[in-house]
């Protein structure tokens, strides 16, 4: 192989390594964002369950009050 071909090959390898490094950084950033999104999702699910419980409690109280009104 000539020196020129080896230089071209070296340049392409360096470029490929740089691309791989950039992609690895991007993957790490996306993993962090995914983890943050998962945590936010878990928090929202927990809040949703709490609100459903409160809603059910209010419905029971309302039924009880309506039952008392019917008895009057």
Swiss-Prot record:
GO cellular component: a single term: cytoplasm
GO biological process terms on file: division septum assembly; FtsZ-dependent cytokinesis
Protein keywords: Cell cycle, Cell division, Coiled coil, Cytoplasm, Septation
Segments for region (Disordered): 34-57
Biased composition (Basic and acidic residues): 42-57
Signal sequence range: none
Gene3D superfamilies membership: 1.20.5.340
Residues in coiled coil: 2-72
One protein family per Pfam: ZapB
Compartments it resides in: Cytoplasm
Assembly with partners or alone: Homodimer. The ends of the coiled-coil dimer bind to each other, forming polymers. Interacts with FtsZ.
Protein's job: Non-essential, abundant cell division factor that is required for proper Z-ring formation. It is recruited early to the divisome by direct interaction with FtsZ, stimulating Z-ring assembly and thereby promoting cell division earlier in the cell cycle. Its recruitment to the Z-ring requires functional FtsA or ZipA.
Protein family membership: Belongs to the ZapB family.
Entry protein name: Cell division protein ZapB
Native species: Mannheimia succiniciproducens (strain KCTC 0769BP / MBEL55E)
Gene assigned in the entry: zapB
């Amino acid at each position: 192989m000539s020196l020129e071909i080896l230089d071209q090959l070296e340049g392409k390898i360096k470029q490929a390594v740089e691309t791989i490094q950039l992609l690895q950084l991007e993957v790490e950033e996306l993993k962090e964002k995914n983890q943050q999104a998962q945590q936010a999702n878990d928090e929202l699910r927990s809040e949703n369950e709490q609100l459903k419980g409160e809603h059910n409690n209010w419905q029971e109280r309302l039924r009880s009050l309506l039952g008392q009104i019917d008895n009057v």
